[in-house]
């Protein structure tokens, strides 16, 4: 459903990047640390059992979840505000992914693992 109003979005923007360990962020990070620690005791398992990031969705999907369906009207009526929210979400997304990457083992050697598929190369993205 989202916050549903421009005023609430402005309040979110004023707060800036949230604490990555607030809410579910801490749970996700701590769970990955736990998995990495447990696998660390079993080098052979660690080599073949890949821990990779959860599906964080994309910046617009996250912005839509924050704002709600009115974000589609805002694209026309308040494009600058939508752009600011997308900037904040993208900045937060990058910071969170960097934090997660500290405990991931999905891009070791010459392969990466995404959604139970092993790909040759360091990343599935061209970027």
Question: Language-model features: where?
Answer:
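Internal, well-ordered domain-core segments that constitute the primary functional module
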Residues: 10-20
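Active-site loop segments of alpha/beta catalytic cores
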Residues: 18-127
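A contiguous, low-structure linker/loop signature
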Residues: 1-11
């Amino acid at each position: 459903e989202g916050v549903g109003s421009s005023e609430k979005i402005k309040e979110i923007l004023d707060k800036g990047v949230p604490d990555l360990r607030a809410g579910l962020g801490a749970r996700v990070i701590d769970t990955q640390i736990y998995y990495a620690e447990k696998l660390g005791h079993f080098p052979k398992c660690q080599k073949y059992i890949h821990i990779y990031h959860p599906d964080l969705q994309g910046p617009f999907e996250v912005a839509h979840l924050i704002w709600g369906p009115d974000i589609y009207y805002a694209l026309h009526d308040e494009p600058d505000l939508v752009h600011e929210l997308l900037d904040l979400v993208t900045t937060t997304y990058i910071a969170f992914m960097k934090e997660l990457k500290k405990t991931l083992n999905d891009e070791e050697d010459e392969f990466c693992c995404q959604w139970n598929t092993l790909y040759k190369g360091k990343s599935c993205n061209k970027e």
